[in-house]
Amino acid sequence: RYGERTQLEFDALVYHAVALSGVTGRRPRIGLLGTASGDPQWFSYRAIEAGRVAGFDVSTLDLFPMPNHADPAAYLLDQDVVWVNGGSVANLLAVWQVHDLEPAFRAAWAAGVVLAGVSAGSICWFDGGCTDSFGPDLRAVTNGLGLLPYGNGVHYDSEERRRPTIHALVGDGTLGVTHCTD
C-alpha cells in the first residue's frame, strides 16, 4: 500500500516477520524475492525505499534474467528475513528448481532466517495449495518446498472460489492437513 512519503509501505505482516527474527542493535536485513512475478524492478525499488523509511536494509535476489548474486545460497543465509512476493507459485517453484535453491532455503530456515511472504510467497514454504497459476480455474500445486508439512489455503475468505477448492483438495486427499489464511 502507499505510504505517507513512499509509493509502498510495509504492512503489519512484514513487521511481524522482522520481530520474529529477533534482530536488535542494527537494521534488520530483508531479502526480497519477486520471482513469482518475474522480479519487477519497479517493485524492488519501491520496497528498498520503504525499507529505508522503516529502518530495514532491503535488498533483492533476482533470478531474471540471471541471478544478481554470484552465490544465492550465501545471500539467503546473510538475511534476517526472506520475503517472497505473490504471483505465480507454479512459475516460482519451477524457477527455484532450475536454480537448485531448495537446499539454500532449507539451510537458511535451519539457521533461523525467517521465511515469509504472501500468496505464492506463502504457499511455497508448504507442501502446496491451490493456485490460479495455470489459468482462471483453480488447480492444486503439490510441489512446494514442504518446510511446513501442510497444505496452505491462501485468499481463503477474499476469493470466493478458494474455500470450496481447498475443501475439495483436502477431501480427495490431494492435500493433507491444510492451514488457511487471508
Identify the role of each PLM range.
Residues 1-27, 32-45, 49-52, 129-131, ...:
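C-terminal and late-domain segments of enzyme folds
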Residues 26, 55-57, 78:
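Short loop/turn motifs at secondary-structure junctions
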Residues 36, 88, 120:
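Active-site metal-binding loops of divalent metal-dependent hydrolases
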Residues 39, 67, 124:
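Flexible, glycine-rich phosphate/dinucleotide-binding loops
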Residues 59-114:
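Flexible gly/pro-rich beta->alpha loop and the following alpha-helix that scaffold active-site loops
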Residues 84, 118, 181:
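A conserved hydrophobic position in a structured secondary element of the catalytic/binding core
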Residues 91-95, 99-161:
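Class I SAM-dependent methyltransferase SAM-binding "motif I" and its flanking Rossmann-like core
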